[in-house]
């Protein structure tokens, strides 16, 4: 065919060889902060009990160790599967370390677009992937300004059942619990 090929200028050229121009770029554009994930040197069950008894959180999902202790707890005061997640790390330098802050996107397509934007801007990320716990899709990246780990998060499920029974996970199930 005789046709002129569109050539992008150096400023608008994509790093993706099969795409002429960079992705439309007004940032990843999250809708809201979704949740925070904390690491703690305190036993997770102790932390989770405090959040339930003193703060009114509901336990949604948890990881139980063979000795009955919790290694992780996903909790919320809203219909979200979690507003906060708490994980036990005996080597955490304090009782409360931010593991990540999660931002919500509308759908999986927005998550894939976010991956393109991060790649175009030279920001290293992990994902996209899917968590078994929470049934959500994710990308993890480090905020180059603050050094804080961010999760770009979508899907998941909402809980409207007043008699919700927390989902128990074991260490043997972490190959699908954390990511697949």
Language model feature labels by segment:
Residues 47-52, 118, 141, 146-147:
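Conserved active-site tyrosine of GNAT-family acetyltransferases
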Residues 39-81:
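Core segments of cupin and vicinal oxygen chelate
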Residues 78-98:
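Flexible internal linker/loop segments at domain or repeat junctions
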Residues 62, 76-78, 87-89, 106, ...:
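Generic beta-strand/beta-sheet core signal
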Residues 35, 82-84, 100, 131-133:
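Histidine-centered active-site/metal-ligand motif
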Residues 65-67, 92-93, 130-134:
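A short beta-turn/loop motif at secondary-structure boundaries
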Residues 1-29, 31-42, 73-74, 93-119, 122-180:
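Vicinal oxygen chelate
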């Amino acid at each position: 065919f005789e046709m002129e090929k569109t050539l992008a200028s150096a400023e608008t050229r994509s790093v993706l060889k099969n795409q002429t121009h960079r992705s439309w770029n007004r940032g990843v554009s999250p809708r809201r902060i979704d949740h925070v994930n904390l690491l703690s040197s305190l036993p997770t069950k102790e932390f989770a009990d405090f959040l339930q008894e003193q703060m009114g959180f509901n336990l949604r999902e948890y990881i139980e160790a063979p000795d009955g202790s919790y290694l992780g707890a996903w909790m919320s005061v809203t219909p979200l599967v979690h507003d906060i997640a708490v994980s036990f790390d005996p080597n955490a330098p304090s009782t409360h370390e931010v593991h990540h802050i999660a931002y919500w996107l509308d759908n999986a397509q927005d998550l894939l677009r976010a991956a393109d934007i991060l790649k175009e801007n030279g920001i290293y990320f992990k994902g996209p992937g899917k968590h078994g716990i929470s049934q959500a899709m994710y990308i993890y990246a480090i905020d180059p300004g603050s050094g804080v780990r961010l999760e770009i998060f979508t899907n998941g499920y909402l809980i409207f059942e007043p008699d919700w029974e927390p989902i128990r996970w074991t260490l043997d199930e972490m190959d699908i619990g954390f990511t697949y």
